[in-house]
Amino acid sequence: MKKAVILISGGLDSTTCLAVAKSKGFSCYALSFDYGQKHHSELVAAEKIAAHFNVVRYEVVTLSIGKLGGSALTDNSLDVPDYGGNESIPITYVPARNTIFLSIALGWAEILDAESILIGASAIDYSGYPDCRPEYIAAFQNLANLATKRGIEGHSIKIEAPLIHLSKAETIKLGYSLGVDYSMTVSCYRANEEGLACGYCDSCELRKKGFKEAEIKDPTQYITKV
C-alpha cells in the first residue's frame, strides 16, 4: 500500500486532510509538532484524531522554536488578538512554521519511502499566512524534487495540499462527506486545557463562518456562549 505522511495539528483543516488521505487509500503516518504553542490542547485532540483514524503510526516532534518568540501563539509577552480581518499578516503568524514542519515531514517521508506528504494549508478563508499559498506549496515541491534521494532518482515525494483552493465551508462539507467528526477538533488559538474555544480569535471566527456558510451545525464547544 502506498504511504503518506500527514501533518495534523488537531484542527479542522488538518483533520479533513487526514480523512482525504484515508479516502485515497494511503497507509497514513501522522505527524504533529509541540513547538511551544500556548493552545496545547490541540495536541491532545491530534492524538485522539490519529487514533480515531487508525493511522499506522503517530509521532509528535518537539521543537524549541517557541523560545525564539515572534508570534502570539508562542510568546507569552504577546496576546492573541480578536479577529481583525485579513488585510495584513497577523501577529499569530509563526515565522517559517510550515517550512520547518514540511522539512521534518520530508525527512520522515524519505525514511518511510512514502509517496506523498499532505498538509491542510488553504489560501481561502485563512489568516493571510504566506506559507499557506499555492506558490509556496509549489516552491516546496521544487525543493523536495532537488533535495531528496527520491527526487534525484526521479521518484519525488509529492507535496499535496488538497484544501488549498477550498473555502472553509467547502472544507467542512468535504470532511462531512468523508465522515469527519469535527467535535473532536480544536482550532482555537486561545483554547483552554479542556479544548474549549474562545470564539473570537481569527481561527474561531473563520471556523464559525465556515459552519454557517456550509449550513452545518457547529459542534464547537466554547468557553462562553458566542
From Swiss-Prot:
Pfam family, one: QueC
Gene3D superfamilies, alphabetized: HUPs (3.40.50.620)
EC number: 6.3.4.20
InterPro entries on file: QueC (IPR018317), Rossmann-like_a/b/a_fold (IPR014729)
GO MF annotation list: ATP binding; ligase activity, forming carbon-nitrogen bonds; zinc ion binding
Keywords of this entry: ATP-binding, Ligase, Metal-binding, Nucleotide-binding, Queuosine biosynthesis, Zinc
Pathway per the UniProt entry: Purine metabolism; 7-cyano-7-deazaguanine biosynthesis
Cofactor names: Zn(2+)
Cofactor note: Binds 1 zinc ion per subunit.
Positions with a binding annotation for ATP: 8-18
Top-tier EC class: ligase
Residue sites binding Zn(2+) per the record: 188, 198, 201, 204
Catalytic reactions on record: 7-carboxy-7-deazaguanine + NH4(+) + ATP = 7-cyano-7-deazaguanine + ADP + phosphate + H2O + H(+)
One of the GO biological process terms: queuosine biosynthetic process
Role description: Catalyzes the ATP-dependent conversion of 7-carboxy-7-deazaguanine (CDG) to 7-cyano-7-deazaguanine (preQ(0)).
Family statement: Belongs to the QueC family.
Listed name of the protein: 7-cyano-7-deazaguanine synthase
Protein's organism: Coxiella burnetii (strain RSA 493 / Nine Mile phase I)
Gene: queC
